[in-house]
Regions:
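C-terminal catalytic core of tyrosine-transesterase DNA break-rejoin enzymes
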Residues: 90, 141, 145-152, 221-224, ...
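Active-site/catalytic core of tyrosine-dependent DNA strand-transfer enzymes
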Residues: 184-232
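Short, polar N-cap/turn motifs at the start of nucleic acid-interacting alpha helices
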Residues: 160-167, 233, 252-271, 282
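C-terminal secondary-structure termini that scaffold catalytic or DNA-interacting sites
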Residues: 193-197, 207-212, 267, 285-296
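Short basic/aromatic active-site micro-motif
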Residues: 46, 135-136, 232-250
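Catalytic-site neighborhood detector that most strongly recognizes the C-terminal catalytic loop/helix
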Residues: 115, 172-176, 186-188, 261-286
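N-terminal DNA-binding module of tyrosine recombinases/phage integrases
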Residues: 1-53, 57
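Basic, Lys/Arg- and aromatic-enriched nucleic-acid-binding interface segment
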Residues: 68-71, 75-79, 90, 94-150, ...
Length: 296
């Protein structure tokens, strides 16, 4: 009962965060904000209303980019604190209940869906193939065919690739869960060819030329390829949107798309449902034309 929120946060950063390398910097920064705001509050006095008050303060914060903090970012601050509180309940028995359990997440606007048209895709793939960077074409093909996140594909290791079964297992994922995606056809052929010239001193599929212990940074060749291909308003993450969009337009069920992308819930793939509906509309139209086209 004597522990304060500051005690909890400091212990969490010291003992737990080192095991969460991918979120260490982000979580530490977010938790320190909470410590600055209400770190001296005893855990026994930590209330839902107090946290809500600070959440609303956070939502009015102006960022370094001179913009009000987005609901999504506020929700990440809330998630960091809630995770730490849950750890104190389960593992340390410092608290009996999480006061954040009753607090709703801020409503986030639906994210944009930017995907490549057929013409854009062909231009971009041609530009990547002609790039001075000999690996750019392969990594873009892999991104489009697997829907993997940028770091998942950039940090891919040979130990996570089964060329015989045609399977990639992403182990360094955003939600710390393993995910396997089949690799077939052209992408598998390209990766097989690439495996024949892999470096002996690195398990990384796309290692840096200067330091094989780290992954290659594709930002510059990627930007140049976009310019050459005349593809505008397109980010690397949109390759992931493109993969999901193509799956939806080919009639793949939302649950399957979620599994391929590594989403725990269907809510993150609902943005693609209209594409699936458009595809189904075309299918029904074609079927009706074939069945009834000659009838007056």
């Amino acid at each position: 009962q004597k522990h304060t929120l500051s005690d909890l946060i400091q212990r969490y950063i010291r003992d737990v965060l080192p095991r969460k390398a991918k979120v260490y910097v982000e979580y530490a920064s977010q938790l320190k904000w909470w410590e600055e705001q209400i770190g001296d509050v005893r855990l026994s006095d930590l209330s839902t209303s107090l946290i809500t008050e600070k959440r609303d303060l956070l939502s009015r914060t102006i960022t370094n980019r001179k913009k009000q903090m987005s609901p999504a970012r506020v929700n990440r601050y809330m998630a960091a604190l809630s995770t730490a509180l849950n750890t104190s309940i389960r593992e340390w028995e410092w608290m009996e209940d999480n006061p954040m359990r009753k607090i709703s997440k801020l409503k986030e606007p639906r994210g944009r869906v930017r995907y490549l048209s057929d013409e854009e895709r062909e231009r971009l793939l041609d530009a990547c193939k002609d790039s001075a960077n000999t690996n750019l074409y392969l990594i873009v093909v892999l991104a489009l065919s697997t829907g993997a996140r940028q770091q998942e594909i950039w940090d891919l290791r040979w130990s996570d690739v089964n060329l015989i079964k045609g399977l990639i297992t992403f182990s360094e994922t955003k939600n710390d869960e393993f995910r396997s995606v089949p690799l077939k056809g052209h992408p598998l052929k390209l990766l097989l060819e690439h495996s024949r010239i892999r470096r002996d001193d690195s398990d990384i599929v796309f290692p840096s030329k200067k330091n094989p212990a780290v992954s290659y940074d594709f930002r510059n060749p990627w930007k140049k390829a976009l310019v050459v291909a005349e593809v505008e308003d397109f980010r690397w993450h949109d390759l992931r949107h493109s993969c999901a969009s193509y799956l939806a337009m080919n009639g793949v069920q939302m649950r399957t798309i979620a599994e391929i992308l590594g989403h725990k819930t269907l809510s993150m793939v609902q943005r693609y449902t209209h594409l699936n509906a458009e595809h189904l509309s075309d299918v029904i139209s074609d079927m009706n034309n074939k069945m009834f086209g000659n009838r007056s």
